[in-house]
């Protein structure tokens, strides 16, 4: 028989924070249905939220969470046409060179060949950066590694910020690609030099449960529904709030995105224009690409986050 080891003190159990408890509550479970009764719904229940004191009106179609000062939710603020344009650009252009993605970052780190150029997002694509590219190793924004921010993205951010009376210079952006079962753990966006500057976040595709807490994970977060066309703006102290996405709900994408026939400029089968220029202009290049996008959006979510770096 082997030598018996001396008994050791049991390892300390990791602390379960209030934020972690909320994440566990909303993440998919197989046996018990998820209770969404506490999720704040500002698309259909804004008036009730105002009456209950959960939010206050902060501008045309904008609401500030009462217990999360500086966080504004703008439900349904992005029009369907603008959603279509953004969705197609995220799907077909923003992950292509010279964009930085999790795949190009891994290839550079490991010294392997860069990923092949593809029309649709690869299945293992998780994020892509625009404008000033983010260095994930050093947690800094490169001054010498930047591309012009797409004009329609910058203009959208200007319009959204104007609704709550703030301004920003859109310098850097990240597109997050959520597929069924994907989540985003609680985190703080703290790489920017000046975190008093606004951060704009736009949701496209399937609905999500969004959690926003406080300056530590010990603060119990508020759960908010985010649907396609909703925007959030983080300002002031809200830039230091922990936030995350514990749940994406497949098959909740609105018809104006998921149905090819809902696209007003859907091309004929002879179009065949798959150029970057067509994607960047927001024009569906051809029937095949449009079908691919609609199929992707039926079960997925796109999240565009834009910020001013401030240095």
Question: Which residues does each predicted region cover?
Answer:
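Non-heme Fe(II) oxygenase metal-center motifs and adjacent flexible, charged/small-residue loops
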Residues: 1-311
């Amino acid at each position: 028989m082997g030598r018996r080891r001396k008994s050791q003190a049991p390892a300390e159990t990791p602390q379960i924070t209030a934020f972690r408890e909320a994440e566990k509550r909303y993440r998919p479970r197989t046996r018990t249905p998820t209770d969404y009764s506490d999720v704040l719904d500002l698309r259909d229940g804004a008036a009730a939220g105002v009456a209950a004191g959960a939010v206050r009106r902060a501008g045309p179609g904008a609401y500030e969470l009462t217990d999360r000062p500086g966080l504004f939710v703008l439900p349904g603020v992005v029009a369907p046409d603008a959603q279509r344009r953004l969705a197609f650009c995220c799907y077909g252009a923003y992950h292509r060179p010279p964009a930085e993605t999790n795949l190009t970052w891994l290839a550079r780190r490991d010294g392997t060949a860069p990923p092949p150029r593809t029309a649709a997002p690869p299945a293992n694509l998780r994020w892509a950066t625009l404008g000033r590219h983010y260095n994930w190793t050093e947690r800094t924004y490169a001054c010498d590694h930047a591309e012009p921010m797409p004009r329609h993205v910058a203009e959208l951010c200007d319009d959204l910020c104007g609704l709550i009376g703030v301004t920003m210079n859109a310098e850097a952006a990240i597109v997050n690609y959520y597929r069924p079962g994907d989540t985003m753990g609680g985190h703080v966006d703290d790489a920017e030099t000046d975190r008093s500057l606004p951060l704009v976040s736009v949701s496209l595709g399937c609905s999500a449960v969004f959690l926003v807490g406080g300056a530590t994970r010990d603060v119990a977060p508020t759960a908010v529904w985010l649907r396609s066309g909703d925007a959030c703006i983080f300002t002031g102290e809200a830039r230091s709030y922990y936030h995350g996405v514990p749940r994406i709900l497949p098959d909740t994408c609105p018809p104006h995105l998921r149905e090819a026939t809902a696209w007003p400029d859907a091309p004929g089968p002879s179009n065949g224009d798959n150029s970057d220029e067509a994607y960047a202009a927001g024009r569906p290049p051809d029937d095949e690409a449009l079908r691919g996008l609609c199929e992707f959006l039926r079960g997925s979510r796109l999240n565009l986050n834009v910020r001013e770096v401030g240095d």
